[in-house]
Regions:
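Walker A (P-loop) phosphate-binding loop of P-loop NTPases
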Residues: 346
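Conserved lysine of the Walker
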Residues: 349
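Conserved helicase motor core of SF1/SF2 NTP-dependent helicases
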Residues: 355, 359, 363-365, 371-383, ...
Length: 736
């Protein structure tokens, strides 16, 4: 098993078919007279049609030997008996066995051509009216259109499922649209790399300076740079990048850009002296966020009386004394519709947040606690002793196949019931998510946004939390005082040193902070492995699953790739009792810690209490619980959710014994081991070190070169993100 093969035959029966994604299990009668099971993306397969399947033999735990289809060439039925089987299979609604036999009896082997090209002749058959003849012909043309689109994709080695997607988006015009403009495949609906779509188009005879090529390059650069955090690109940068991508002079590209601006395909606006170019979606998102927040600030919430009394009551019952800024935060939360609460570790954000929640409870408000990640939501719920959930799940996020975009059940037409919403880890919230959240808040709802402005910005487009703070328009409480009990933590002390541009005190080596000097990368890695495998579990009672290794980079001797190889070998080595599955350079093994690396809005999960749902998101960390013997199905556990992954979903997973600091944003771990090793200059900066250190709850160990933490603390270089949100807020909002 596992051998590659190519078989040719005729479909005998269809065992299973998913009309949404084209996944099919069928029996194929080969030319040698054998019946084999084939599984894969073969949309609208039906008995009687011929096909040549290329794939890999596997053994399914329930269904035995079968071929996992990678590529398929299909041909329409040729013989009369095959045509009857094909039409009687249910492939055309309204055609059963008797009608299929009458059609073939009348038109013979010409039946399928008549269905497609001469539908008026179908009404010669008893029981088929002229109207029904046209309906049958239309349905058949759609099927043949899908088949031709599949053949078109296969010709250029593109996945067959893209044909299904193209027909969802463009219907019967799919093949024509793609032939006219293959660069459509590089758009959000399909996600094909521009270089691949470009290679395909040029091989089809498109000119290097065709308008559709230049337009696609401009949109690709805007969308690609959203992944780098930019909401817009300066016009000159966009022109240069697109020109470089397709090898044309910038002035040739500029003409196309002007046309796209005139047509509204790209939005253009002056932003702080720069002519910025936006995708329409991000332009509208930025305008909406600014306008919504400003309207919330203008909303007449009314004066709340007795706030001081509530604060004093909380102080008495909890035996604490709030600092002046904490009291101010509680008061502002009551009086203002929007509040920003920021501060570093140990400055009392959690205490202030709990006080605000208690005040809102006293006011009788319906309260929602939200965070951008599952770990952050769990932590927030524990600290506030209330249920908290992710923003995505609260808003009912899903994925729209037709547009290639995220959609939400909750919004302006169906807002949340909440009267007060508190959002933690705001530095992780990007512009599109902020737009979705604000659109779901009903008029009069209060919003408290909590976070640490000095942490790294969101992975997605925008610098929302920082922009809100720097705009000066949103009420802000910035907690700075480190409380006495927190000041005993060397993690917190050193984090504040780093945030002030001073390297951490590496000589501390007591309490919750330790530094182990290792200047050779091999020694750094071996020390990390030893800490995770033996020293921390045996000396400090910290289990390996409570330890997270962080490093600034994926690449290099101390990057996540190499660290994960070494940690997997030490913590979860091969065993006869553990099944495993190889995927590229990775070997997934039962017991492995893994991370989801892209949003999957459709994958189904089940909680321990039987609750069902969908969606596993970028950054979610889980454990491989079980791998079936064939390696084609993996059972993963993400906290209290169990999820089934098929082999074709493994490109969404990576090992997570070690992860990058960026991936750790919004999460907190009992123990963190941080690598201080050489890396790209853009990664050895203050924000990366500060974010990494503040991920540790009880123990932080830095392993590496003793010169690097100080260099990182001194380097406050921040990668610029092009965003106009701060300006829009300052200027009072802008209409989209």
């Amino acid at each position: 098993m596992g051998e590659r093969c190519t078989v040719e035959g005729t479909v005998q029966s269809v065992v299973f078919q998913n009309e949404e994604n084209g996944y099919t299990v069928l029996s194929l009668l080969t030319e040698q007279g054998e019946v084999v099971t084939v599984a894969g993306c073969i949309p609208y397969a039906a008995p009687g049609e011929g096909m040549t399947v290329t794939g890999v033999w596997i053994t399914h735990p329930l269904y035995g030997p079968q071929i996992t289809c990678e590529q398929v060439e299909r041909r329409m039925p040729r013989e009369e008996e095959e045509i009857v089987s094909y039409l009687a299979s249910g492939i055309l609604k309204g055609v059963g066995q008797a009608t299929a036999e009458r059609l073939v009896e009348r038109f013979g082997t010409d039946t399928l051509r008549v269905l497609e090209e001469e539908p008026e002749r179908l009404s010669q058959i008893k029981g088929i009216t002229a109207k029904k003849a046209m309906e049958l012909s239309k349905a058949f043309r759609e099927l043949t259109g899908l088949r031709r689109t599949m053949e078109f994709m296969a010709r250029y080695d593109l996945p067959v499922h893209l044909a299904v997607q193209a027909h969802r988006v463009y219907g019967a015009q799919a093949l024509q649209r793609l032939r006219e403009d293959p660069y459509l495949l590089a758009g959000q609906s399909f996600g094909v790399e521009f270089s691949r779509a470009d290679e395909m188009a040029l091989s089809m005879g498109f000119d290097g300076d065709s308008p559709c090529r230049t337009q696609a390059a401009l949109l690709y650069e805007l969308q690609h740079n959203q992944g780098n955090g930019h909401v817009f690109l300066p016009r000159e940068k966009l022109l240069w990048a697109a020109a470089q991508l397709i090898g044309l002079p910038p002035d040739r590209v500029e003409m196309c850009l002007d046309t796209m601006v005139e047509q509204g395909a790209i939005r253009q606006e002056q932003v702080a002296g720069v002519l910025g170019c936006y995708t329409p979606e991000l332009y509208e998102a930025e305008c909406f966020v600014a306008n919504k927040l400003l309207s919330m600030l203008r909303f007449p919430y009314g004066k709340v009386r007795g706030v001081d009394g509530v604060i004093e009551e909380m102080e008495m019952t909890q035996g604490i004394r709030y600092a002046p800024l904490q009291r101010e935060a509680v008061t502002l939360a009551a009086q203002s519709g929007v509040l920003l609460l920021t501060g570093g570790p140990g400055t009392g954000k959690t205490t202030a947040t709990r006080a605000i929640v208690h005040l809102f409870e006293k006011m009788g408000l319906d309260i929602l606690l939200l965070a951008p990640t599952g770990r952050a939501a769990k932590r927030m719920g524990e600290l506030c002793e209330r249920e908290a959930q992710t923003i995505h799940r609260c808003l009912g996020m899903s994925y729209n196949d037709l547009t290639g975009r995220v959609t939400y059940k909750k919004g302006e037409s169906d807002p949340l019931e909440a009267e007060a919403v508190l959002v933690d880890e705001m530095s992780r919230v990007d512009l599109p998510l902020m737009q979705a959240l604000l659109s779901a808040l009903r008029p009069g709802c209060r919003l408290v946004m909590i976070g640490d402005a000095d942490q790294l910005p969101s992975v997605g487009a925008g610098n929302v939390f920082s922009d809100l703070i720097r705009s000066g328009r949103i009420p802000l409480v910035a907690l700075k005082e480190v409380f006495r009990q927190a000041d005993k933590s060397y993690i917190i002390r050193n984090a504040h040193l780093v945030n002030g541009g001073i390297g951490p005190d590496l000589k501390t080596n007591q309490g919750d902070f330790f530094f182990l000097c290792r200047r050779v990368p091999e020694r750094m890695v071996s020390t990390v492995v030893e800490l995770c495998k033996t020293r921390l579990p045996e000396k400090m009672g910290i289990a390996p699953e409570d330890i997270q290794v962080l490093t600034p980079t994926r690449r290099g001797e101390c990057g996540t790739v190499q660290l994960n190889r070494c940690l997997q070998a030490a913590l979860n080595p091969p065993s006869r009792t553990k099944n495993e599955k190889q995927f590229g350079d990775l070997i997934f093994r039962e017991g492995d810690r893994v991370m989801q690396t892209k949003n999957n809005y459709d994958v189904l999960w089940e909680k321990d209490d039987g609750t069902m749902g969908a969606g596993i998101f970028n950054g979610d960390v889980g454990t491989v619980e079980e791998i079936d013997p064939s390696g084609e199905l993996l059972t993963l556990r993400f906290d209290d959710r169990t999820v089934g992954y098929t082999a074709d979903m493994l490109n969404q997973l990576d090992m997570a014994y070690a992860i990058t600091v960026h991936k750790a944003q919004g999460s907190e771990y009992k123990a963190v081991i941080l690598l201080a090793a050489p890396a790209a200059p853009g990664l050895l900066v203050r924000g990366v070190l500060y974010t990494a250190m503040t991920r540790a709850r009880e123990l932080l160990i830095i392993v590496g070169d003793d010169t690097i933490p100080g260099q990182m603390a001194e380097n406050d270089r921040r990668t610029r993100r092009y965003s106009g949100l701060r300006r829009r807020l300052k200027e009072g909002g802008t209409q989209a």
